[in-house]
Structure formats: C-alpha cells, structure tokens
C-alpha cells in the first residue's frame, strides 16, 4: 500500500469502522484537525501523535502508518500497559444506573483512604503497582457514596470523589489508553464543579491542564490554568496553605506550557511568580497532588531549561538542587530523567546513562512509563557509550523496554 501517512490513517480508521470525530476525540483533537491530516493539508504529525493514532487504531506496527517497510513495534515507543490497568479501567467504566442499596461509606473514612493512597503514591518506587491495587475499590466506593448521599453530605462526597479521580490521573497517564486520561481529568473537574468547591475545581483543572498540554492545545491549557488560579485568589488571605500551594502549582504549569511552545520570557515570568509563592510557603511545605514546593520549583527550572533548549540554564538549576530534597520518589525520579535530558541534548552518552540508571533505582515505575526516558534508552541502545554496552542492556532490561 503505497500511500502518504494521512491516507494510511484514513484507511485504517475506515477499516476499524471508526468515524473521524471518534478518533479525533480519542486523540484530544478536533475532527477538522484529523481531516486536515488525512487529506494532507497540514504536515504529518510527529512521532508521539503517530503513536497515539496507532494505539487508538489498535495497530501493532507503526510502519502501517509511516509506510517505511520496516517493522516498528508500537510497544517499544508507546510504553507498557500496567498489569492492573484493566481493573482500574473497569472501575472507571462501570456505569451503574440502578439505585444504590448498600449503606454509603463514611465520607471522612473515604477521605482518609484517599490521604493514605497519596502517601503510598509518593513513597513507593513501584507506585503504579501500589495504586493499581488501591484504586479499583476506592473508585467504586467513592462513586457509590457520592450517588447515595444527599445535600451537604453529597457535596462533601463529591469533593472526595474529585480527589480520587485526581489521583487516578497519575495512574492512567502515559499508558496505552489515552481516553482514560481525558475521562479522569474531566470527571475530576466535573465532580468539583458539582460540589461548588473552588479548591477541588482548581485540582481538577490542574489535571486537565496536563492533558491539554500533552495534546498540544497550548492556549486552552493556559486559559484553564489561569482561570483556575484566579478562582482561588479571593480566598488566599484566609485559606489554608494548600490553596496557595495549588495557585503556585498552576503558575508553574503555565510556565511549563510556555516553555513547551518555546516562549522563554513568558515561561520564566510565570516560574518567578510560582517561585515567590513557594518561598512564602516555607522550606517544609509540599502540596500533595502537585508536589509543589521549593525543591520542586528548582526541578521545574531544570525542565524549563531543557524544554527551551538552553542547557546552560538547565544545568545551573540542576547543580543548585540536591535531588534527595524532593520527598516524592516518583517526582524525584522524574527530575533525574529531566537532568538526563540535559546530558542527552549535549551529546553526553555516559552522563545520560548514569542519570537514567539513578532514576531507575529511585523510582522504577516512573522511568518505565516515561516517554523521554524511553527515547533516550532507545538511542543509547543504538549507540552505546564506549565500554557501556552491557550497562545499557542491563538498564534496558530493568526498565522493561522490549528492544530486539
């Protein structure tokens, strides 16, 4: 089949019996965008989007879309499917419409279970496995309780349910079911809106901003993050510290989006606003959902430098931060991957390998599901540093990357 990429996408979409709006929805794009891709009116999507299209169309070989004649297993680039994903997905998609007859769970008890689940998430190297065992029951119980209660109790239950979806967002991210990312982010925000709780709405918005950002919907991400931050502003003088932490985290997200689109001045302006908030909150403060803190703001500075391709700025920020000051193992692992990206941009293979090895030892299930880490490992496997071929193979094996 000698066809351009756009026509190949249309061929496999038609073969799957999938309409253009349905596929576009799974990708977080508009039907008009997909039509432009299929007809060749806009340039071919980049690799991350091609992978998402291949996954949505249930293709095992990326060459079905690229047409280069060489097998390119989607699983190598797209990452693994966690063993518990089906169970979490089942809990999310059990649409129960019959009346709840069982006694609802205690809302304070649900809130405590959620608090403990967050603690597990931040303190475990295998955080996805731990969440995979906790989330199905927590999702079902929180959903049933929110349906069974009335009045103010239902509002309180919906706040907890929004928080459960915010936690689930970390589990479903970077797995081969992108529709679940949109589902949990939308539900987190919707439940918070139904509860009329500004703080929960900001938390749901923070989750949705991640999805919008990764879909390249920059303006929507910035608008939502700005609106959510502004929603909190009238309360900050008297609200708990977490409200200020959430506002700071939203500023940090705006900075990240600007960096992703290459806007240096805007990125650093919002980073500085978030940094001022972190400084006011003190050295011991850390926001549970977003990990917002002084140490993580320094980690954000590394990421801004990397995204803006200013490795000198990124390296200075990295040198100013002891990774051990980041309490969350998952977030610490991500930071080490970002430092590895500095070395990769500089063509430093041994440095890249050393940082990725550290990241794997800190949080094995962060690196296994991180696309940047996967790409760097694939490059290292193709061109290992001198004398490090076996070390690369060992790390690839520990990460679980299926490279022939």
What annotation goes with each model-predicted range?
Residues 114-404:
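Conserved binding/catalytic microenvironments
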Residues 58-74, 297:
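Short C-terminal boundary/hinge segments that cap the last helix of small helical domains
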Residues 67-93:
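Short, charged recognition helix plus adjacent turn
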Residues 13, 24, 54:
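The alpha-helix within a helix-turn-helix
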Residues 9, 20-24, 34-38, 65:
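Conserved hydrophobic/aromatic packing and binding residues within compact polymer-binding modules
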Residues 1-16:
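A short, Lys/Arg-rich alpha-helix, primarily the initiator
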Residues 28, 48-64:
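DNA major-groove recognition helix of helix-turn-helix/homeodomain DNA-binding modules
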Residues 28-44, 70:
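Recognition helix of helix-turn-helix/homeodomain-like DNA-binding domains
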